[in-house]
Amino acid sequence: MVSRPAMSPVSPVWPRKPNLWAFWVLRLVLLLSLKSWAEDTLQHCTWLLVLNKFEKVGLHLSKDRFQDHEPIDTVAKVFQKLTDSPIDPSENYLSFPYYLQINFSCPGQNSEELARKGHLMGMKPMVRINYMYSVNFYRWEMENLQILMEAAPMRSTGYCPAEAMCILNWYTPMPFKNGSVVSSVDIYTNGIGPFIPKKRFYVNMNGFLKRDASGKSLFAIGYESLVLKSSHFRLSKSRPLWYTVNHAPVFILGGFYDEKAILFSDSNFQDYVLLELSIDSCWVGSFYCPILGFSATIHDAIATESTLFIRQNQLVYYFTGTYSTLFDKSHGSSRWVRVLPSECIKRLCPVYFSGNGSEYVLALTTGKNEGYIHIGTITDGLVSFEMVPDGWSVCEKLPGKNCSIDWATYITDERNLLLLVKIDSGQFYLVNFNTEFKTLNILYKIPEFIPEAKELDFLVLLDTVTYTNTPMTPKGLFFNTLNNMLYIWGNFILQSYNREEFIFLADFPKESTIKYMVNSFKGQMAVVTENEEIWYFLEGGYDVYQVVPSQGWRTYLKLQKMQKSPLYSTNESLVSLFYQDENLFQLVYLFDVGKERLVKRLLPVGTLMEYNLPKPFTVVNQGNYKMITFTNTCPFKAIHAVDVPKKQHASRTESYVALPPLVSESLGFHNNNTLAVYQGLVYYLLWLHSKYDKPYADPVHDPTWRWWQHKTKDKDYFFYLFSNRLAAEGIYINMNAYQKLYNMSGDYGIPDLFFLDKGNWFTFTVVLLSHQDTFTSSDSQGPTINVDKKLSLSLVLADPECLSVTATREFLLNRNTLLTKIKVIDKKRCSEQGMVGRNIKKTSMLIKVLGAPGNCIQRTYLGDHIQGIRLVPIFIGCPPGKRLAFDVSYTIKHSEEINKHYFDCVIKDAEMPCFLFRDLFQPFFLVQDLVTGDSGSFLGSYVLKVVGGGRTLNTIRDYTEEEIFRYNSPLDTTNSLIWKTKVERTTEDKKFYIMSHESPGVEWLCLENSPCYDIIPQSIYPPEFFFKLLVSNRGVDNSTYCDYKLTFIVHIHGLPLSSKRSSFIVMVSTSFFIALVVFYILFCLVWPHIVKAWVSFRWKIHNMMAPETYSSSSSSGGFTLHSHSSEGSFEGPSRPGTKEDNVQAKRAKVA
């Protein structure tokens, strides 16, 4: 839980008086009245939640369905106005199409007034949304994700007499993520205001809607009935609710007499609609199909993650929803599809757990293919059926000529089909068929009669058992994958740990016949009989309790009627019974005249069992008085767990927090623009999470780190603008309010789920506080030696070959306390290496206090809970939230140490540093834990391959398998290796090297036939190449169950040229240099002669032009000058600029 500082109202200044007794009395009265008010409203106030479309936010009575599954572009204009904020307006901010509208109500009080009062007191609803991962881990990586948000208050649109009197609601965005269609919403307060218990809602995607031409939403699977008639329920008995556990976004329930209608809900029956299905209802009965009559009733209905299945008569239909977050829209159905048209299907059986990335449904045949079974597989919305066994019938392996498969259940992890088979003599067999190896085994021959078990809670069925005259009538099977418990039920209950030896539960009467079973998969089970009785028992125990009808039920019903509860009536009919989050719920139709309605209500098993418990007492004399002393039925006074791993870490849940931006409005109310900003920020936060897959390890492996990396230094400036009402749009975005949480507080208690990697372990301590007489006896003044008989804790492992457990006990006599420290360790045997979510072994540990089940009830303000027994699910395999990353920082540091230098590229790239070709390259990797925030060096073994490359980032191409072998394998003989190493360890086939953090490193080769051979420089810088490397530890690492696979790019510079090209360049360069030297020498020798010739040539030209210049002068003067010039010409030319030249020039001027 994330807490924020809240403003406290200023206390009034009370005048000082010598005596303040009156004040303290008044204060005490006020506190007592507040306490009584809190206790009175604690269990009655409840949260209200509806879904609003983006454009309908602010409409008080608006309610929408989760039909749109893609983000919308509606907030970009708002973000462009946020100039003075830490966000980058140039980023593309999208939004989700829905908001969550939150409010609460308290019986007998004005809800609108309560909401305004709570807001003014500082109450803020906190919303935590948990996303369920997809069953197809091949397409979507298994991850547990949750986001914590704070709801923003907003006045509803419409008329209100005064601003402070407007209807108030709280809003948060309703984000969704790819690979998830099921999301739970937990709502609770920040601890201020009225007491409202935390409540969970399911807001699931609905892929079975369509829009008509006007844009109105309609159901694609049928026609919605606006009226739910009582006649729909008077002639119909209760029926089971079948669905894939934790993954079905919608629930469907058939069974309406002679009507092709179903109840449909996308909120776990928080609301619902009645749909008349649009199916053809063809009658194809024949002599292959021994069905006597036709009925429109939908007999079986099963919901999976994406597909709905129904059976009407002998026909089976399916409809695949349109879920763009799971698969392509083209996989969705436009109408009901009939499958197995030539088969006569007598029953559909559910498969509660997925396996191998798919879901399953079982169809039992009758008629011509009696003895066969059809297994339906659903993968990405695509449905296929396979008939097994192939080529032979189950009946051929059993005594007699004919047989009938009455029930089937599929163990997906083992690929085993458990079949309840009846032969023509009436004998029932439990048969196992393995779909992988196509083998069939008879596991157990079910007794023909009910065993004799007078005054016993249970009976182990051995050969010495005596039987009554009441025949056993098996009706079905139930298998719990978590604890390997198998149940055969009918007018009896048989349970088995190993599917071969069975225990008869004697508390269930043979006069009743079970109609269906429901399981919480947390250790509790309930059964409904043909007479609508409800029986309850705890797995791992042997006691079966009747809760409806019972004395406790009659007492509870009277109390509810006295309180005028609207959920109970004297005339009602049970529709279905199902578990939700360990709580047992009834779907009941109430036949109150004028108020007929269908309600979902909690069946308080703990309260009913407490009312049913005997109240033993004794009368003792105390002086002159007699006192009644009640005997404790529970062996302990209190129980709790300490030193427990954090639930977030144990269940491997990644958590984010997103709080609304602060607004400058005086009362703190938001508007459409501020909520749009909230939408965009939440979308961007989850977008960063989905895109965070950097192969290079960041200094902080947090998706939000780069978001605010360069903005945090200005946070005081942004707050200054906001506090002075200078911020754009009056909004302040707190950067610390959008981040990842690694250590959530407030999640105490034993986690609901543990993930264990190879060889990992976890510990916690169970504290049992005993009654005063546990450690002492009447004949002993000190501690008794028989404490174990009064207070003892047992641990039961569902798969002891997979896990080991140790329990260390410590007695604290002075505190009457027993401490039991429990440590569970993985034995490294029951799971194989694989990607996240694959090869997960589902198992559990049962913690049980001796004598506690059924006798220990804890009373809380949320109801009564059964104590002393707890099933702890444990998943063995690669846990979610771990990734491998290239530790480039340490690789550079280590490269500098071993090579005594490090040369980066001339043009540096901080995101992708360079490595020199001639240096030894030794990569290091980090295992980053995205749940805890920890990271550490990967110390396991791995195989490194160059799987692609190119001269630039844009020209990188992936190599073929043949090329990968030639470029990386030590067995290559084509002179194509890119690199080599001195490591001697190789894979079993000798094809590739096996490396580790202790390996000597990689030496780059780039031989003649490799793609990096003889790279021509494109500029003055040396040649460079980009290598695409693949690192995988699959099959070579024994330190983890995780199959790490990392692909990253390494930039190598300074690649050498080939010998031919080098020789050619040397020859050309040498020749050019020699030519240049020769030219220089020749130039130095010839240049003086060239200069002398030029001067002589110039002088001659000058002399030739001189007579023409002076031809216009006087004859005497010209003759004299000419004569003088003629004489001087015999002396040879003088150097320019000499003294003689100057004298001659002066003479010529005078003349």
UniProtKB/Swiss-Prot annotation:
Membrane-crossing segments per the record: 1064-1084
Chief place where the protein resides: membrane
Residues in compartment: Cytoplasmic: 1085-1151
Keyword flag Cell wall biogenesis/degradation: no
Family: Belongs to the CATSPERG family.
Protein name as catalogued: Cation channel sperm-associated protein subunit gamma 1
Compartment list: Membrane
Compositional bias segments (type: Low complexity): 1113-1123
InterPro entries (UniProt xref): CATSPERG, CATSPERG_b-prop, CATSPERG_C, CATSPERG_Ig-like, CATSPERG_N
Extracellular topological domain residue ranges: 39-1063
One cellular component term from this protein's GO annotations in UniProt: sperm principal piece
Highest taxon of the lineage: Eukaryota
Native source species: Mus musculus (Mouse)
Glycan attachment positions: 356
Keyword rRNA-binding: no
Signal peptide: 1-38
Keywords: Glycoprotein, Membrane, Signal, Transmembrane, Transmembrane helix
Pfam families reported in the protein's UniProt record: CATSPERG_beta-prop, CATSPERG_C, CATSPERG_Ig-like, CATSPERG_NTD
